[in-house]
């Protein structure tokens, strides 16, 4: 009979291929529109053609070339959950034009796509993303068409194999695939080795390598067909409820390709390990003997990469777990923000920075002066004052409305409030610099930092008041900070609450913040509108729709990022579980090979009174060395990296990445990984030793 482990691997491969295909296509659908052959990004315009003229030209081009072209536009009020496609009509080889009547087949349930005729796009600025459905070469022709209309554009093929590999290499799902492959290969090899005695008996009956493989494949056929039917039925049932079988052929193709690749690796391993058993003569093979040296080398070739992978995944799990905990703690603050929104600026206008600043900056200043805005700009403290030896931290550039919404306490526990109108009338507009008490004595360097973030008309000698704040305060900033560099944190971390920030408080709508500053803060989600209608009114009344393409509710944005982190945590936890399983299988396998090779010596040493540790000193020494390397590798690498970063910081150069901080959670996960790995080997070795002692060397 075929070993149960081999049957399990083939069933598991089919299941995990379907899961990976689902997750991958869902992510593709959320990142862009499926089914396209090319994406054209129009990034510059001579403003010689109106949006309606561009739409008519696109419709004519699509009809002449037999393709469909669609312009993607984010929803103004719900950009992360809804998008709009403005499509050309007519017939094309892809059949995509039917979406105008039937709607877009959404694979992901988290995103709604509304389809409109391209004529409905009106006078919208033509800069943005256009999808081409049809022959890929049509995209170059469309770029030439755009050029004739005074538009500059680039072409990409995000769904092509090369660009997908580039985009997803080192992603979580990429490593999930290889973790699954490693687990499948390990379990297959172990199962074949455990069947060495059965293969020896079959060899004694005259079976060749090919005969053994054909026999195994024949025995796999029935369970494989049953598993394929079960996985197909479950997948169809799930997809029917989830998205009404949207993109079913794409899902089936990808799942089949992934399953085929995994099965190829499994079958290659199967053949290789059977061939390995032929290195032992038939009579010894009948007794269960293994090619110990070759088998041990093979196991360690799997085990060492698995150890390194497990360490990497374990540290990722710890990092994502901390991030998830932080985001969970911040949910209350975001809920209290209510309907507040930030704005998303048009990325297609990156080549017209001055024009954007001229339009957006004054509008934001007026809105700030009218009390419609909470300003929450951020800057990295060390980058503002290089060479000052200040510790890592953040400077928050906020307005007085921010001060009324978020409490900031002085050293006595009293809350700072905006300057009274009567005091302002007497002394004029002034900037308040609030410094944490822990940074007291650095006023000169911090004043220099203030000069670096405010407009050129600011005079720190006559327009700046410096105050101290209570140390240990955490200030909510309305955004995660991932758009702003910080020397102490990675961009993936949630920095919605900043510990002991330096606050620069400017009067609402004052000239201390330049138009460029307002625009930059808005692009970094640092300009918050408590009432979304204020933005909508400004867009409609001031024709700002060219520059502001969407509103982003701060609470919804936080919830979406929380969902992404939870999904990543689950996948990473799954990867960790699989890598630990591989380590356990490999650890038990090395003990089994060792015990079979040395059974007679172990039995002889036992009856001669050798101590357990002395009997197994070689394998125990190897395992202790592996456990030591496993336990110290990450801390040692962190120490080396921090030494280099500290040397850079001592020279006064701002750090390009934060210092590595190993928390108790990191060390606990590493210690647990070492304990599981080393404990499994010790337990397996003790079991094999006991069996040899009880039953004699020939019975192992």
Where are these regions (language model features)?
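Nucleotide-cofactor and metal-assisted catalytic machinery
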Residues: 2-160, 320-569
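N-terminal membrane-entry
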Residues: 162-181, 252-257, 559-583, 666-672
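C-terminal membrane-exit region of the final transmembrane helix in multipass inner-membrane proteins
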Residues: 191, 196, 259-292, 594-597, ...
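Hydrophobic alpha-helical segments
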Residues: 157-280
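Short helix-loop junctions at transmembrane helix boundaries
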Residues: 231-258, 560, 627-674, 686
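Internal/C-terminal transmembrane anchor helices
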Residues: 11, 286-322
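Selective transmembrane-helix segments that form parts of the transport pathway or gating/packing helices
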Residues: 7-13, 210-236, 255-265, 298-305, ...
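Interfacial "coupling" helices/loops that link adjacent transmembrane helices in transporter permeases
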Residues: 186-221, 586-624
């Amino acid at each position: 009979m075929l070993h149960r482990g081999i049957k399990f691997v083939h069933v598991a491969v089919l299941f995990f291929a379907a899961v990976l295909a689902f997750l991958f296509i869902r992510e593709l659908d959320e990142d862009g529109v499926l089914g396209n052959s090319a994406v054209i990004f129009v990034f510059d315009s001579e403003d010689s053609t109106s949006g309606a003229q561009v739409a008519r030209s696109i419709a004519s081009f699509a009809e002449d070339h037999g393709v469909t072209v669609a312009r993607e536009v984010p929803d103004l009020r719900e950009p992360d959950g809804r998008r709009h496609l403005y499509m050309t009509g007519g017939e094309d080889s892809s059949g995509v034009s039917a979406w105008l009547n039937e709607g877009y087949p959404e694979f992901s349930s988290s995103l709604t796509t509304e389809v409109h005729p391209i004529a409905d796009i009106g006078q919208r600025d033509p800069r943005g993303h256009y999808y081409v459905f049809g022959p890929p070469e049509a995209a170059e022709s469309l770029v030439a068409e755009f050029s004739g209309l005074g538009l500059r554009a680039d072409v990409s093929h995000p769904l092509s194999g090369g660009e997908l590999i580039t985009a997803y290499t080192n992603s979580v799902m990429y490593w999930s695939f290889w973790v699954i492959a490693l687990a499948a290969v390990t379990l297959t090899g172990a199962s074949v080795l455990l069947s060495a005695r059965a293969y020896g008996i079959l060899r004694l009956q005259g079976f060749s390598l090919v005969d053994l493989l054909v026999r195994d494949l024949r025995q796999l056929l029935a369970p494989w067909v049953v598993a394929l039917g079960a996985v197909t039925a479950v997948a169809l049932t799930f997809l029917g409820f989830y998205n009404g079988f949207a993109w079913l052929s794409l899902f089936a193709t990808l799942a089949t390709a992934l399953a085929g690749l995994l099965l190829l690796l499994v079958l290659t391993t199967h053949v290789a390990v059977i061939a390995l058993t032929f290195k032992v003569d038939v009579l010894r093979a009948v007794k269960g003997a293994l090619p110990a040296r070759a088998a041990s080398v093979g196991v360690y070739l799997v085990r060492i990469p698995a150890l390194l992978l497990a360490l990497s995944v374990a540290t990722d799990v710890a990092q994502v777990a901390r991030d998830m905990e932080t985001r969970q703690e911040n949910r209350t603050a975001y809920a209290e923000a209510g309907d507040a929104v930030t704005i998303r600026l048009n990325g297609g206008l990156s080549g017209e920075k001055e024009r954007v600043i001229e339009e957006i900056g004054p509008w934001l200043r007026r809105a700030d002066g009218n009390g419609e805005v909470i300003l929450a700009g951020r800057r990295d403290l060390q980058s503002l004052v290089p060479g000052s030896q200040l510790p890592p931290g953040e400077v928050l550039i906020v307005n007085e409305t921010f001060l009324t919404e978020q409490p900031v306490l002085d050293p006595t526990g009293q809350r700072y409030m905006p300057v009274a109108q009567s005091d302002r009338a007497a002394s004029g507009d002034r900037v308040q610099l609030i410094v944490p008490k822990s940074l007291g004595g650095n006023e000169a360097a911090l004043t220099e930092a203030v000069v670096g973030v405010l407009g050129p008309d600011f005079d720190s000698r006559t327009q700046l008041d410096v105050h101290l704040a209570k140390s240990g305060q955490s200030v909510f900033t309305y955004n995660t900070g991932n758009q702003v560099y910080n020397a102490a944190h990675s961009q993936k971390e949630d920095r919605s609450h900043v510990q002991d920030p330096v606050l620069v408080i400017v009067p609402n709508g004052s000239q201390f913040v330049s138009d460029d500053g307002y625009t930059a803060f808005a692009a970094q989600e640092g300009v918050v509108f408590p009432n979304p209608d204020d933005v909508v009114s400004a867009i409609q009344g001031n024709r700002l729709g060219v520059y502001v393409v969407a509103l982003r509710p701060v609470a919804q944005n936080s919830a979406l990022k929380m969902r992404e982190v939870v999904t990543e945590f689950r996948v990473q936890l799954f990867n960790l579980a699989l890598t630990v399983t591989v380590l356990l299988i490999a650890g038990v396998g090395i003990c089994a090979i060792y015990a079979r090779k040395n059974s007679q010596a172990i039995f002889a040493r036992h009856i001669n009174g050798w101590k357990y540790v002395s009997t197994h000193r070689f394998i125990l020494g190897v395992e202790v060395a592996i456990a030591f390397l496993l336990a110290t590798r990450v801390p040692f690498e962190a120490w080396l990296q921090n030494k280099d970063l500290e040397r850079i910081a001592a020279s006064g150069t701002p750090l390009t990445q934060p210092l590595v901080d190993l928390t108790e959670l990191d060390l606990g996960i590493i210690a647990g990984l070492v304990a599981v790995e080393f404990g499994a080997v010790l337990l397996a070795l003790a079991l094999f030793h006991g069996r040899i002692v009880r039953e004699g060397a020939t019975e192992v």
